[in-house]
């Protein structure tokens, strides 16, 4: 990184609430269509022209595994629809305000607030769905509602999205070759941290203009990291999550009111990672790499505020109790493991 970055930057865009009416483009998808065993689900995907074997590895199932069956059903429906967008040239749904969104999902037993929370956790757990924006649509069909994500304008049309998908996969595969050469999970996580920080710089101009050009900058998506050279915290965190999971390392992205960072599991213990705060104007560092919760909460009041997770993460998050002792110039050393990690 060579561009000037404001120290300790954030840049998470808040989720915006939009409304829309069901249209012909909303297929009769029900949550019950996707509560099937793995074989039936695979057959459904194949019948839609989908091959998800190279993509599903990038997402995290840690929070999904803690959900109720009704919550999982809603997640499964969104997952199948997004996988179709990722692996086919199907067009997204045109919205009444001139944008694009996912197809709606009907038949859920979830209340509106729970549906929103599941949708948010789904989005932050699946960085491979780079086309998802930050608008959460409530789609109405009579008295029934569905909560689904808006889609970046450039990715609404299937043929154009297919080109973007190829670009995302090409960069991920290029990085994967370097990551696979590392001998341990710890070294792989360090390599992922370094690759991201070395490739991109913090998009301060976008933050300064209040994200007015977000529709063409993609800062809230992994696309900004893999296919451009600038991003904000959301891009850093989702890229780290994607490449860790793709390398067989459990990682999740979590959010506060203004920031996004990661928690990663190594040797059965969880650690915090903040690539954004490690990427500084003079280069990249390791002060926020593989740290425990106590460090993030005590190194400064600003850090504590920025790393206070939003309320919908409550009861899902693992405790990060061990610390690498990293510093600005060294990535630290993981301590001897004495017990099992807290779930997820």
Please describe what each predicted stretch is.
Residues 4-149, 337, 343-344:
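Intrinsically disordered, low-complexity N-terminal segments that are enriched in acidic
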Residues 147, 188-192, 236:
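Residue-level detector of well-ordered alpha-helical segments, enriched
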Residues 149-155:
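Extended, well-ordered protein cores
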Residues 159-225:
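Secondary-structure boundary elements
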Residues 218, 225-232, 236:
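Secondary-structure capping and boundary motifs in well-ordered enzyme cores
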Residues 234-298:
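Hydrophobic/aromatic-rich core segments of domains that either
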Residues 270-272, 276-344:
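His-Asp-centered catalytic microenvironments across diverse enzyme cores
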């Amino acid at each position: 990184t060579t561009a000037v970055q404001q120290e300790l930057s954030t840049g998470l865009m808040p989720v915006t609430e939009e409304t829309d009416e069901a249209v012909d483009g909303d297929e009769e998808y029900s949550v019950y269509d996707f509560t099937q065993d793995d074989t039936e689900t695979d057959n459904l995907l194949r019948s839609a022209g989908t091959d998800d074997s190279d993509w599903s590895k990038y997402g995290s199932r840690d929070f999904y595994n803690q959900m109720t069956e009704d919550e999982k059903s809603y997640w499964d429906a969104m997952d199948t629809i997004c996988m179709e967008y990722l692996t086919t040239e199907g067009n997204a749904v045109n919205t009444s305000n001139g944008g694009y969104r996912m197809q709606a999902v009907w038949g859920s037993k979830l209340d509106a607030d729970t549906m929103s929370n599941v949708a948010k956790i789904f989005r932050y757990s699946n960085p491979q769905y780079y086309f998802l924006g930050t608008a959460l649509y409530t789609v109405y069909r009579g008295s029934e509602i569905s909560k689904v994500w808006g889609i970046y304008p450039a990715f609404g049309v299937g043929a154009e999205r297919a080109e973007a998908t190829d670009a995302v996969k090409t960069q991920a595969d290029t990085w994967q070759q370097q990551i696979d050469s590392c001998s341990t999970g710890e070294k792989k996580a360090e390599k992922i941290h370094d690759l991201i920080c070395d490739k991109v710089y913090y998009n301060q101009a976008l933050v300064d203009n209040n994200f007015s050009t977000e529709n063409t900058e993609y800062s809230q998506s992994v696309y900004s990291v893999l296919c451009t050279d600038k991003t904000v915290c959301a891009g850093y965190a989702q890229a780290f999550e994607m490449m860790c999971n793709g390398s067989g390392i459990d990682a999740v992205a979590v959010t506060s009111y203004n920031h996004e960072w990661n928690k990663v599991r190594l040797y059965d213990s969880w650690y915090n990672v903040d690539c954004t705060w490690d990427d500084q104007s003079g280069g990249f560092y390791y002060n926020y790499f593989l740290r425990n919760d106590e460090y993030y909460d005590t190194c400064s009041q600003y850090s504590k505020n920025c790393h206070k997770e939003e309320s919908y993460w409550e009861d899902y998050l693992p405790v990060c109790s061990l610390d690498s002792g990293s510093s600005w110039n060294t990535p630290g050393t993981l301590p001897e493991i004495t017990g099992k990690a807290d779930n997820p």
